[in-house]
Regions:
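Transmembrane alpha-helices and adjacent helix-loop boundaries
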Residues: 1-294
């Protein structure tokens, strides 16, 4: 019990002294996670769409060559960035680019750290999102693509107007999952000096050596951020699903199969009201009372 009281006192003392610093770290973490997730989704969307462009055996050689080349490059990108830790990716991008370009390309100053962090987390997120988008596109019924082609739509029109809207809705849980992962994985940006939430913890601990009490604040902070993100994303998913109070009209299955079912707001081709309307229309056409006649 005394240990818990001591822990509470240490946590309270740390928070009273460094609350603005902790909150600044939370702000930087959230901003980086949001921006990187958005850019990562764009990268993943482009890679997923390019990876699913179809080609026929009789297509031109150059078209098939470039499509195969694009798929190979996307595959290499996905495998490399999914198969290596983000902390090493940060080292290679932040320190490797200046090394290979003799400092012609470098990330200097506060803005340079921000730019490097956004690039690193975005590229990493894009590698995961590329496979999610590809899976979302493949999951759509092929009959919808065939129907779109049957009415004269091109591949890009079909993708933009038919496939992608459904695929994006299907991968919303993966987008939310990547956002939550990014909230936590931004902690590796301390390796390049970016002052996110975990880097703040390391700095404060270096000043007062209260490692565990500061870790408790970090744990509570990250858990709060991820829980809020989870609730918010579920609310967005429910909103995308639309109204859940739709009611199905009950009718006899034989009537439905025969095509004689009358919708409450419309008439069927076989009921009395519809027959009278058809007769009136025929008479108006017969006597010239058509559109354009006064």
């Amino acid at each position: 019990m005394d240990v818990l009281l001591e822990l509470g006192n240490d946590v309270a003392r740390l928070w009273a002294t460094y609350a603005p610093t902790y909150l600044n770290g939370v702000k930087n973490t959230l901003i980086l996670a949001v921006i990187a997730t958005l850019f990562g989704c764009i990268i993943g969307l482009l890679c997923g769409v390019l990876n699913t462009i179809p080609y026929a055996p009789h297509d031109h050689f150059l078209k098939k060559f470039f499509l195969k080349l694009i798929r190979a490059l996307v595959r290499i990108y996905v495998e490399v960035f999914r198969g290596t830790p983000m902390v090493l990716q940060a080292v290679f991008i932040y320190y490797g680019l200046p090394y290979f370009t003799h400092n012609e390309v470098s990330f200097t100053g506060y803005s340079g750290m921000w730019l490097a962090s956004i690039i690193i987390v975005s590229i990493n997120t894009g590698a995961y999102m590329a496979e999610s988008v590809r899976g979302g596109i493949i999951s759509i019924d092929p009959g919808q693509t065939e129907g779109a082609k049957a009415i004269g739509m091109t591949h890009w029109q079909t993708m933009m107007n038919v496939i992608l809207p459904q695929a994006i809705r299907n991968i919303m849980p993966q987008i939310g999952n990547n956002f939550i992962i990014n909230i936590k994985d931004t902690s590796v940006m301390f390796i390049i000096g970016f002052m996110e939430f975990f880097a703040v913890h390391r700095t404060i601990v270096g000043n007062n050596f209260l490692y565990f009490p500061s870790a408790v604040i970090e744990m509570v902070g990250y858990l709060t951020l991820t829980l809020l993100a989870s609730f918010g994303l579920r609310a967005i998913e429910k909103r995308l699903d639309g109204d859940s109070s739709y009611q199905l009209a009950h009718t006899d299955q034989l009537t439905m199969a025969a095509g004689t079912y009358s919708h409450p707001a419309r008439s069927s081709p076989f009921d009395e009201k519809s027959t009278d309307q058809i007769k009136k229309t025929r008479l108006s056409l017969k006597h010239g009372r058509n559109r354009g006649e006064r």
